[in-house]
Amino acid sequence: MSMMLSNWALSPRYVGQRNLIHCTTLFHTLTRWAKDADDKYHDINSMYENMFTPSNDNVSILQDEGKSDYDTTKTSSMQEDISAFNKDLYNFYNIGYAKQIMSASQLENIVKAKGRFVIQSLSTSPYYNLALENYVFKNTPRAKRGPDNCRLLFYINDRCAVIGKNQNLWQEVDLAKLKSKNFELLRRFSGGGTVLHDLGNVNYSYLTSREKFETKFFNKMIIKWLNSLNPELRLDLNERGDIIQDGFKISGSAYKIAGGKAYHHATMLLNADLEQFSGLLEPSLPNNMEWESSGVHSVKSKIKNVGIITPNQFIAVVSERFQKTFKVDGEIPIYYCDEFKSINDEIKDAMNTLQSEQWKYFSGPKFSVKIKDKGLTIKVEKGMIYDCDRNDLIGLEFKGFLENIDSYT
């Protein structure tokens, strides 16, 4: 793996991966791969499974405790067709199920036991992925002696804007533009600023003990690993600990420390649709509003894609280097999760919290806003107006007030 990244990216294994990503005719691509398939392509071929993973609309999950398979009595005909097609592909081409997805009980046993591992989520649901990350963090045991239980998690989210736990969302995002471009809004469980995700962005989360935690450590490792593959990448670290390339930010970070453990999670812009990001972090608010908030304010930065690395290549490289660098006793395994099998009540509860309007709009810091030309000052806590120059506004939801501001002012 000491060769230049440009050569590494053209190896047969990764050319196949890139062809898969850019293919226009799925069946012809599958056929071409099947003819050349052997054991060394098995991991690449397994990526076909992701293409046929059903959406939440097409799957009903068994709710009974101890069960983790699909409820065949409630499964839609579309899901049955997808499953049948996957099985046909597997039987004919010997591909499709190489990535063994953990059941809920397997996930619980692995996370709550001591040891180091890598988890890759095959889901693109931001609600599931953030809930999974939270589950792994909360349930990782503290090492009383010996090596700490450091873990690495990867996930790729569909379009979404993710604000920090302690941010005033109305100062961070344009809700109307998010809706028009089909971006979900999430408030995560950690601090930090607002970031935008799509399928061209990889999120990684490094978990370790509080004693071993250092905010810039893992990004330094990322830079070292990627630059060693291709020095032309010229990745560097800025004073905030973000990864930059040619002065442009390609990775943003956030952190959480609790219960003697800590994690650093970050984005990596690889081939994101940056055009779609335009304007989403520029709230369309009246110019006569003056804000005061104790919350965290995002730092605006120029961004770009790394460009010559695909998401799957990035995950493969960082996983391999993590396995080699953090190996203690035995190999560090890689596990796979999705929102259909690798889910339990704790993850579901976290997903419900993330999806709730209460968490999105009625949490966050206290703030006040002055409407200058109206001589009006409004104070807000937990999304509710609790103090104002006009008594008739006290007790209103700030969200509703802002959506109908002309009628109130």
Swiss-Prot record:
Pfam families noted in UniProt: LplA-B_cat
Domain BPL/LPL catalytic, residue spans: 146-330
This protein's GO CC annotations: mitochondrion
GO molecular function, one term: ATP binding
GO biological process: protein modification process
Reaction(s) catalysed by this chain's protein: L-lysyl-[lipoyl-carrier protein] + (R)-lipoate + ATP = N(6)-[(R)-lipoyl]-L-lysyl-[lipoyl-carrier protein] + AMP + diphosphate + H(+)
Keyword ATP-binding listed: yes
Record: residues binding ATP: 188, 193-196, 249
Pathway membership: Protein modification; protein lipoylation via exogenous pathway; protein N(6)-(lipoyl)lysine from lipoate: step 1/2; Protein modification; protein lipoylation via exogenous pathway; protein N(6)-(lipoyl)lysine from lipoate: step 2/2
Coiled coil: none
Keywords noted in UniProt: ATP-binding, Ligase, Nucleotide-binding
Cell cycle as UniProt keyword: no
Enzyme Commission number(s) of this protein: 6.3.1.20
Binding-site positions, (R)-lipoate: 249
Cross-referenced InterPro entries: aa-tRNA-synth_II/BPL/LPL (IPR045864), BPL_LPL_catalytic (IPR004143), LipoylTrfase_LipoateP_Ligase (IPR004562)
Subunit structure: Monomer.
UniProt family annotation: Belongs to the LplA family.
Other notes: In the transfer reaction, the free carboxyl group of lipoic acid is attached via an amide linkage to the epsilon-amino group of a specific lysine residue of lipoyl domains of lipoate-dependent enzymes.
Function of the protein: Catalyzes both the ATP-dependent activation of exogenously supplied lipoate to lipoyl-AMP and the transfer of the activated lipoyl onto the lipoyl domains of lipoate-dependent enzymes.
Protein's name according to its UniProt entry: Putative lipoate-protein ligase A
Organism: Saccharomyces cerevisiae (strain RM11-1a)
